[in-house]
C-alpha cells in the first residue's frame, strides 16, 4: 500500500509542476487559452482527483 501512496504522491507533484509551468505559458501565448483550455481543464481535474486520492490513501497509511 505504501508504494501506491508514493506513486500517487509523485504523480501529484509531477502534475503540479506541469500545471505551474504550463498554465502561465498557455495564458501568455497568443490564442493559447482558446485552443488549449481543454488540456488545462483536464490537468486541473486530474490534479483534484489526485489530491483526494492522496488524502484517502494517507488514511490507510497512518
Curated annotation (Swiss-Prot):
Superkingdom, natural source: Eukaryota
Keywords carried by this UniProt record: Chloroplast, Membrane, Photosynthesis, Photosystem II, Plastid, Reaction center, Thylakoid, Transmembrane, Transmembrane helix
A UniProt-annotated Pfam family: Ycf9
Subunit and partners: PSII is composed of 1 copy each of membrane proteins PsbA, PsbB, PsbC, PsbD, PsbE, PsbF, PsbH, PsbI, PsbJ, PsbK, PsbL, PsbM, PsbT, PsbY, PsbZ, Psb30/Ycf12, at least 3 peripheral proteins of the oxygen-evolving complex and a large number of cofactors. It forms dimeric complexes.
Function recorded in the entry: May control the interaction of photosystem II (PSII) cores with the light-harvesting antenna, regulates electron flow through the 2 photosystem reaction centers. PSII is a light-driven water plastoquinone oxidoreductase, using light energy to abstract electrons from H(2)O, generating a proton gradient subsequently used for ATP formation.
Assigned protein family: Belongs to the PsbZ family.
Name this polypeptide is given: Photosystem II reaction center protein Z
Amino acid at each position: 500500500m505504501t508504494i501506491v501512496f508514493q506513486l500517487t504522491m509523485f504523480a501529484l507533484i509531477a502534475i503540479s509542476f506541469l500545471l505551474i509551468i504550463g498554465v502561465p505559458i498557455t495564458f501568455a501565448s497568443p490564442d493559447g487559452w482558446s485552443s488549449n483550455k481543454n488540456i488545462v481543464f483536464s490537468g486541473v481535474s486530474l490534479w483534484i482527483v489526485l489530491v483526494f486520492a492522496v488524502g484517502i490513501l494517507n488514511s490507510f497509511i497512518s
